[in-house]
Amino acid sequence: MKVLLIHSDYLEFEAKQKTKIAEDTDILNGKMEECLTVFMAVEKEDEENPQNVIYNTVDEIIKTAENLKINNVVVYPYAHLSSELSSPKVAKEVLQKIEEELKQKNYSVLRAPFGWYKSFKISCKGHPLSELSRKITTERKEEKGETEAKDRPKNKFYILDGEKGEEGLKELDEKKVKKLKDKGLKSVAMHEMGIKHGGKEKDIEPPHVKFITEKEICDYEPSSDAGHFRWYPKGKLIRDLLQDYVYNMVVENNGMPVETPVMYDLGNKAIKEHADKFGERQYRFKQGNKDLMLRFAACFGQFMMKKDMYILPKHLPLKLYELSTYSFRYEQRGELVGLKRLRGFTMPDMHTVCKDTKQTIEEFENQFWMCLKTGDDLNTPYSTIFRFTEDFFEENKEWFFKVAKEYKEKYGKDVILELIPERKHYWVGKVDMAVIDSFGRPIENPTVQIDVESAKRFNIVVHDGNEKTYPVILHCSPTGSIERVLCGLLEKASLDADAGAPPMLPVWLSPIQARVIPVADAHSEYALSVAKKLRENGIRADFDDREESVGKKIRNAGKDWVPFVIVIGDKEVENNILTTTIREKSTLKKPVKENLTVEELIEKIKEETKGFPYRPLSLPLYCSLQPIFR
């Protein structure tokens, strides 16, 4: 069942003409005000268990209506939501039953007739939750009041002081969470435990959304689907550098880069089972007689590749890596937020085949530290949450406490632990790391997951003599999506500005690392020679030759977050020195300047960027020739 839920000022329809499958009805027109309009398409797969589809659809409608605090519901058959429709007989029965169930629960219901050509008018309220789409399956959901749901143990959350080992493990509840001193862990715990955040409202635009356009990094592409971006030269450079950074890190850790398709056939049983575990937030479509999907991660291609490999124990741990350009998730339109939540994104994705539990936890630990290093390198400190099933935790808790202790020793931070009574997902353990945004909310980035299910599903085997075994597979994204990395960097820059520091990106990621500004025309020749020499030495520099005052040029360099701004006048030309404002050492109120030779400046920038990837600047050397994208 596909449904589209619209919070409406009103819905008005008129049945115009019967089709061959039209139901007989006296209700040929109708209008309802202040309502939830539910457009529905009953699908072929719903015929397997129509009762569960009815139950789940009614449950979804009621949840939405309660959130919106409305009691009027319009049930509107709308075949255009799906290309795989059920038989007319089943569709009529399902829609009628949904109407009856809602009425029994004291909702006022208007149902448009099935099988008629209808005209309709609708007015959508236009708030973030006013347009929602859902894919309803035949899998039965349970009511809150059902015994099974009541008896099922809930996940438990703990805070762990790694220095104290098991004695440092304290269970969390809402009261204790709100008293946590570590703002990052408090934010993560509140988010995971469903505790209402007391900060700024969700619909306020986060600072990074302004930055991405203001700094000519990227912007929404209006001619594409919502949540897809176009990247300008500066943004493309930043993204490419981040991709190079992850590539180098993975290869240094023995990962083997591969490339796989973005599109997969849902007729493959393993592909469909894996895709179905991620719910309805997918791009699916029909081409000829094939049902296809766009990938939401690189799992599909890598697993199919591993299935065809002849893997021996000596090959393990075996790591395949792909930068999935692109991955796709059909997030709800009202949930799309800049680079934090979007529909098309770039995901570094590594999958490691492990021999046994010992090798699995060794690799998990190695990849945990690798992920943490990305936070160090990007200067975006992470808050960390571990999640384990209770069985896995009990079997491996000594190892976990050892890792938590080492983490505390290095970073001085506690961790959150979530214990899950029974395995619900493909993994038995994972670690997630988050950057905290300007509103105090987590941006989930790196992750490592212990997958005990996919090897069997995709028939990935390790050949050991005459035996074939299904290995454990680690999923790892060392940084999280490239877009979210940039989101975290920009949100941190906003927090830095709030604290009085000039916002900036790390020097190795700054599109323009140095800008040379002449005071007057007489200084231009020397200033230009400096800019050229910087470029010749692998520094992304430009030369501000625009017809503007020196003050405005300096302000523009500040707006562009240029880390090193060199102003050249008489003194600089005569003494062969560069008066350089160093952004990282400055405050918003007081710039810090140093007198450097060209060689000293080059050495300084080289030292700042040592060990990080480099790409040249594609923009012209002369600022006057650089095109304006925004």
Swiss-Prot record:
GO terms for biological process: threonyl-tRNA aminoacylation. GO terms for cellular component: cytoplasm. Keywords: Aminoacyl-tRNA synthetase, ATP-binding, Cytoplasm, Ligase, Metal-binding, Nucleotide-binding, Protein biosynthesis, RNA-binding, tRNA-binding, Zinc. It is an enzyme of class 6 (ligase). Residues 207-506 are annotated as: Catalytic. Zn(2+) binds at residues 299, 351, 475. CDD domains: ThrRS_anticodon. Residues 1-137 are annotated as: Editing domain. It catalyses: tRNA(Thr) + L-threonine + ATP = L-threonyl-tRNA(Thr) + AMP + diphosphate + H(+). It is found in: Cytoplasm. Its EC number is 6.1.1.3. It holds the Pfam family tRNA-synt_2b. Its main location: cytoplasm. Its cofactor is Zn(2+). Binds 1 zinc ion per subunit. The keyword Plastid does not apply. InterPro entries: aa-tRNA-synt_IIb (IPR002314), aa-tRNA-synth_II (IPR006195), aa-tRNA-synth_II/BPL/LPL (IPR045864), Anticodon-bd (IPR004154), Anticodon-bd_dom_sf (IPR036621), DTD-like_sf (IPR023509), Thr-tRNA-ligase_IIa (IPR002320), Threonyl-tRNA_syn_edit_dom_arc (IPR015011). The N-terminal domain is an archaea-specific tRNA-editing domain that hydrolyzes incorrectly charged L-seryl-tRNA(Thr). Catalysis of tRNA editing is performed by the charged tRNA itself. NCBIfam families: PRK03991.1 (NF003068), thrS (TIGR00418). Catalyzes the attachment of threonine to tRNA(Thr) in a two-step reaction: L-threonine is first activated by ATP to form Thr-AMP and then transferred to the acceptor end of tRNA(Thr). Also edits incorrectly charged L-seryl-tRNA(Thr). Homodimer. Belongs to the class-II aminoacyl-tRNA synthetase family. This is Threonine--tRNA ligase. The lineage of its organism: Archaea, Methanobacteriati, Methanobacteriota, Methanomada group, Methanococci.
